[in-house]
Amino acid sequence: MLIYNADSVVFLFSLFLQFEINHLQDEHLESVDAYYNKKSYGLQAIQFKTNFRTSELMGYSYECTMFTLAVKGKKIIGFHGSDNVHIYSLGAYFTSITPTRLEVKGGMGGKKWEDGFDHDNVSKIQVLGGFEGILYIKVDYIKNGKLETGLIHGDSGGDGFLQKMEINQSKNEYLVYVEGYYDDASETIQGLHFQTNLNNPVMMGYKKGRKFLLASNGNKIIGFHGYADKSLNSLGAYFSRATPNKLECQGDCRGMSWDDGCNYDGVRKVFVDGIGNEIYTVRFEYDNGGKVEKTPYRRDVKNEKEFVLDYPNEFITSVEGTLAAPKSVNITWITSLTFKTSKKRSSPTFGSASSRKFVLEKNGSPLVGFHGYNSVGNTLNSLGAYYRPIPPTPDVEKLKAQGGVEELLGMMVFELDPLERITSVEGTYDDKIGGITMLRFKTNKKDSPYFGFGTLPSFVLHKDNHQIVGFHGKSSNMLHQLGVHVLPNGFKFVS
């Protein structure tokens, strides 16, 4: 029996097996692999794949024929089929995946242009730069597997220098973010810095002016829009969910599969269990938008040890391992693991190293999730990983100080826990004394007490979908003005 709702899929095959889909993290079901018995024609096993991870195989695939339910660029929203004692057929309903639109950054001068979002990928970018900034941008796309030539947005008749960038489709390369520089005086974008998932950066134009960022974590750019006339005035982008950047399993890819997925921001802790030249199991403590998620035990542990990272200031960038080379048994397993980080640190070597080495890494990108196979017996047979390029932290934005002219008693403390962030500050200003008489802080978890006198705020320091990361203001023997520095939610300082 197959039971499906918006949050989970349940498959009943002698036992109750369930696979949950996290819609709050934009996870959706992309495909289903089903296995039917050649003699009874009943469905004997099933496996679900989302945009982040793959479920365990539910049932048994022995002496079965496999078929797949999938439509490129769409997600599954329902099922249909036939059953009696067994499920004999299975089909699915699909719908399109809505892209994410990031509004334009820069100025509002010029004429509006729109490339749209119904593309598979960006193919080629051309930018004509001049002394006063970028004169035009032209982007070619891949649509339904074919090249689609884009239009020129801006002034094609100006004098300048032409720069080009091509995206390598054969290596599944795609754009992950664009960093731009805008000059307020000329109302023109001065430079554009493009970054791909393969860590191939290209800078076009000049790093001059106010910096902005077009990025959507875990997504790829599939289209652009903006404003232009005699020059490029502003730029926005469309994003769709990217195929996970997956490093395939190293070792023996047989046994019981497991997949933690790739929808994490980073790894906080690593737990490895093993004795001698046998690694039994590995599990991880991840960070997911500030929430700590620890993967479950995959078996009873005997000698588990841990490696702690300084997250969010430190990431795993590579895993070095070794494999057993037994002469009498036609299998292998992992005998040792060593984790290396962005701070040039290495974990202790877990297990006992052999001469058969492997490495999981991708151009220094953070490894944000893992998958692998465990044997039915004791050992970890293979290990793979997911990696993700991390967009740069945008420039801190400064909100104007609130209060009075440029000319309480005791001390009170409001403490935040490590995963808590300030989202807004309320305050009251007294014109007679020229100072702030009350402050109240709000976080993503709670509100502070009222500091000072009064409970009716006369100003609020807040920006939607941003967190407060610093303060500024003016004071003498009292606080006259208070302002804040903000960053978009989800961005973290990484050294």
From Swiss-Prot:
Gene3D superfamilies: Jacalin-like lectin domain. Residues 1-96, 99-241, 244-389, 403-488 form the Jacalin-type lectin domain. It comes from Arabidopsis thaliana (Mouse-ear cress). PANTHER family: JACALIN-RELATED LECTIN 3, JACALIN-RELATED LECTIN 46-RELATED. Coiled coil: none annotated. GO terms for molecular function: carbohydrate binding. PROSITE patterns: JACALIN_LECTIN (PS51752). The lineage of its organism: Eukaryota, Viridiplantae, Streptophyta, Embryophyta, Tracheophyta. Disulfide bonds: none annotated. InterPro entries: Jacalin-like_lectin_dom, Jacalin-like_lectin_dom_plant, Jacalin-like_lectin_dom_sf. Pfam families: Jacalin. CDD domains: Jacalin. This is Jacalin-related lectin 43. Belongs to the jacalin lectin family. The keyword DNA repair does not apply. Keywords: Lectin, Repeat.
